Design a protein with these regions (language model features):
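Intrinsically disordered, low-complexity terminal tails of fungal membrane proteins
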Residues: 1-3, 249, 253-291
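Alpha-helical transmembrane segments in multipass membrane proteins, preferentially the mid-helix core
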Residues: 42-45, 142-146, 164-185, 202-210
Length: 291
């Protein structure tokens, strides 16, 4: 492992800018995060070839999340996809701070992936799922705007994003739990949603001391964010895979990836079953009047 790290010359090939920027040690850590994402992606893709219940929806979702995470962390570990922004605080310590926008690209995909997975598990409506995804996008984009604002007005964007996060927490912990109770999946749902919201609670804190307040170094910020991201996407991916083995996919109405748009073989196709047609009731013949 030491030999591998000594070969890391990414920051020599891609020189860093800004008074506070990524260090070689930070790049080493980010390569390790990239490796975990890549390995998880390969495992998930392999498992999708023969999924339980014949359904691949959760495999598809987390495979996308893991692949995007691999690409974005590769970019960050290589010292790419960043901007240098003047700091609003600590001007005597560092006049500029390195902001990696690839991190936000990862979240724009990762947050909707877990939201969609939880929505499918809980059985909430598609309108609720779309609403939750837009809340996540508002959260991430507001934080991105905050990171790129060099004045104290950045905290306005931070407040908007945090408000969207609080709404999202309510949606996943209350609305989703209420819906999951109908399917007798309250325990599994609360385990997954509770873990996700515990991680989400730490993202505003991490942002506040990193890209927002510029209180910690770029390397320390990526140690913080890297752990959170690993526990969120790879962690939840394998948790979903483990718990889904005993879920009733028919009750969840998730039988829509084991066959194509055209029925080409045998399988469980609940939404293709036509409702039974009641037999018509014929009227009794009129009685012939007596003569």
């Amino acid at each position: 492992m030491v030999v591998i790290f000594t070969r890391n010359d990414a920051l020599n090939i891609n020189p860093q800018a800004g008074d506070t920027h990524l260090s070689v040690g930070g790049s080493d850590w980010l390569w390790a995060v990239t490796a975990v994402y890549l390995l998880s992606f390969l495992i998930f893709f392999a498992l999708s070839l023969k999924p339980p219940h014949g359904e691949k929806i959760f495999h598809y979702l987390f495979t996308i999340g893991l692949l995007v995470g691999t690409i974005t962390y590769y970019a960050i570990a290589s010292g790419l996809a960043y901007s240098v922004i003047p700091t609003q605080r600590n001007r005597g310590h560092a006049a500029s701070y390195q902001i990696f926008f690839a991190k936000y690209i990862n979240w724009v995909v990762a947050f909707p992936v877990v939201i969609l997975a939880l929505g499918l598990l809980s059985g909430v409506s598609w309108a609720t799922i779309v609403f939750n995804i837009f809340l996540a996008w508002i959260w991430v984009i507001s934080y991105l705007c905050s990171a790129y604002t060099a004045t104290s007005y950045k905290w306005g964007f931070f407040a908007f994003g945090t408000a969207a996060y609080l709404l999202l927490a309510f949606q996943t912990l209350h609305v989703g739990r209420t819906s999951a109770r109908r399917l007798n999946l309250t325990r599994d749902y609360l385990m997954l949603a509770g873990w996700l919201n515990l991680l989400w609670l730490l993202y505003p804190i991490a942002f506040g001391v990193a890209d927002g307040g510029n209180q910690i170094s770029v390397t320390k910020s990526f140690i913080f964010f890297g752990i959170l991201d690993l526990l969120m996407i790879p962690g939840l991916a394998f948790a979903f895979l483990f718990l889904s083995r005993k879920w009733d996919y028919s009750a969840l109405n998730l039988h829509f990836t084991q066959y194509g748009r055209v029925n080409a073989g045998e399988g469980v196709f609940p939404e293709k079953r036509a409702p039974a047609v009641a037999a018509p009731v014929s009227a009794a013949p009129a009685a012939t009047p007596a003569v």
